[in-house]
């Protein structure tokens, strides 16, 4: 209902609950009829992977705290493909940092480890001792055992399901 109010020009200002990028086309198509303007704010939006570095599972905690594991996760993620699919090509790949123009912006950090390189991701994981795989093709611990890893997301994000599915595919690829 709120989406239609916005598209009809019945709201003065609203972003929460309707500000998902998937609604952008609806708003742009209805600007003239609704007598409003759609504005894309210059802000930092972070769709990201956040590890539970303090999980009670000691083996996962050790893995998640390995710098090379986190780098492998960064290299496995195809940010260009993701932006094209989820945000119709809008956006610029960056690490989760303050935006350009902020006095806290640090370009080297913002652009670190952004390249999509599944070969490098595989090399890093192999180097950590996770080179063996089970019969389903999933990596296992050096002792041959495995763990399940859950990907949790906030369902309030309209793109959360697609984001999680893409992330799971990237993990499967490495």
Where are these regions (language model features)?
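Extracytoplasmic/periplasmic ligand-capture domains
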Residues: 1-88, 92-93, 101-174
């Amino acid at each position: 209902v709120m989406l239609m109010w916005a598209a009809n020009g019945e709201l003065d200002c609203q972003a929460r609950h309707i500000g998902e990028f998937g609604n952008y086309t609806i708003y742009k198509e209805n600007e003239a009829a609704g007598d409003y303007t759609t504005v894309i704010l210059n802000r930092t939006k972070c769709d990201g992977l956040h590890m539970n570095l303090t999980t009670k599972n000691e083996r996962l905690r050790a893995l998640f705290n390995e710098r090379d594991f986190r780098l492998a996760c960064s290299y496995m993620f195809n940010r260009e493909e993701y932006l094209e699919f989820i945000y119709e090509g809008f956006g610029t790949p960056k690490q989760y940092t303050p935006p350009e123009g902020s006095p806290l912006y640090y370009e080297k950090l913002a652009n670190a480890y952004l390249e999509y390189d599944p070969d490098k991701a595989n090399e890093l994981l192999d180097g950590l001792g996770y080179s063996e795989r089970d019969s389903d093709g999933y990596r296992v611990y050096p002792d041959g055992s495995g763990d399940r890893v859950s990907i949790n997301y906030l369902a309030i994000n309209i793109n959360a399901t697609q984001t999680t599915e893409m992330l799971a595919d990237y993990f499967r690829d490495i």
